[in-house]
Amino acid sequence: MTSKSVKITDIIPQRKPFVFIDSLLGCDESSAETSYLIREDSIFTENGVFQTPGLIENIAQSAVAKIGYVSKFIEHGKVTVGYIGNVHHLIVNRNPEVGETIHTTVIFGENIAGIQLCEAVVRAGSEIIAQSSIKTAQDTSMPVDD
């Protein structure tokens, strides 16, 4: 996996306060890894705990970060708006707390008619705190303004 040093908002369509990854740690043809520091001021933090919808969005943004990186820096195209198509087999062992850094690994499966199938694992340290299958889609007719 190759390490990537890029500004996250250059490779995902989301903007603050709806950004739930801090860095793309690496990516290759079949996977991506991101990190995110859980913050008190996150819209998905409640009573010091990052809630499940935030974990889902973190997983989706982790998938889209790799897609955006390839689009912008390899294909020299634009980052486009993406959608969560389906979340399947979501298991949350625990929700992370403020101050913890989570690492999300996404393994890319088939891409069927523009629908990207992925498997994701979210860790805090060596502990698996969540995992899921997810489907995402990119709307190539809706590029994000730089």
Would you name each region that the model predicts?
Residues C27-A32, V64, N111-I115:
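Short, conserved beta-turn/loop elements at beta-strand boundaries and strand-helix junctions
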Residues T2-I8, E100-T104:
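Short Pro/Gly-enriched beta-strand edge/turn motifs at strand-loop
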Residues T9, I21-S23, N47, I91-N95:
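Beta-strand-rich interaction surfaces with strong enrichment in secreted/lumenal proteins
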Residues Q51-H76:
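Active-site helix/loop of acyl-thioester processing domains in fatty-acid/polyketide metabolism
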Residues I67-H103:
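Hydrophobic beta-strand-centered segment that forms part of the acyl-chain substrate-binding groove
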Residues E97-H103, I107-D146:
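HotDog/MaoC-like acyl-thioester-processing domains
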